[in-house]
Amino acid sequence: RLAPNGVRVTLLEPRQSPGAGVAYSTAEPTHRINVPAARMQLAGDEEGAFDHWYRHQPAFTVDVQALRPDGSVYPQRGQFGRYVAQRFADAAASSGGRLRHLRDRALAFHQGTVTTDGGLQLKADLLVLAISHPPPSLPAQAEAWRHHPALIANPWQPGALDAIAPHARVAVMGTGLTMADTVATLDRLGHRGSIVAFSRHGLLSRGNLSGAGATWPGDYQQGSLR
């Protein structure tokens, strides 16, 4: 949008859809954005652009849980990934070939040349690192458990939680939004065993009062190991 004529931009992204990253690539229906859609848009978009786009998608019609009593919408998180991919496709289509997406991974940059995992050598005057968050990985202290059959290092991996027995006891390292994703997915899968989430600070993500959901029927307790 702001680049002068003659500038060519090549995006190296191994995923099929650019712009979704780890968080917005999820296809899990219980994973939702944690702010109203009206507060999410790309730089340069009009305020509420994503909200307007989503309300005109078939997904909005079939997802009855997206619309809250106050009129705001909280789409499944993958919908924002689709929105970003659509905006990228629109920009690429109108760029006259100046913007392209290569499904490849950059390995090195040396003397103005990017080397990719697929063996390409790309000349570049400028290199922009926009790598976002990497997938979850084990902390160094847990490296000895890497191959333990009960350990799930990346709960966002498709199907990662499917093999957990309905009444198995589950421990989650961390009490942030990834923990919330994990609990929501387990609930959808019918898990009814105990879940213990622990972290150094023990704080939960802030709740949202715009919904009219029923009171959680489970036994929730907060404690400390100190």
Regions found by a protein language model. Name each.
Residues 97-113:
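A conserved short coil-to-beta-strand element within the FAD-binding core of flavoproteins
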Residues 117-126, 165-166:
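Core beta-strand elements of the Rossmann-like FAD/NAD(P) dinucleotide-binding domain
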Residues 12-82, 198-226:
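Glycine-rich active-site loop/strand segments that organize a redox cofactor
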Residues 81-100:
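Helical element adjacent to the flavin cofactor pocket in flavoenzyme catalytic cores
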Residues 78, 82-86, 177-180:
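A structural signal for well-ordered alpha-helical segments within the folded catalytic domains
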Residues 1-3, 7-18, 128-226:
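Rossmann-like dinucleotide-binding core of oxidoreductases
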Residues 108-121, 149:
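Conserved beta-strand-loop-beta-strand element in the redox core of flavoprotein oxidoreductases
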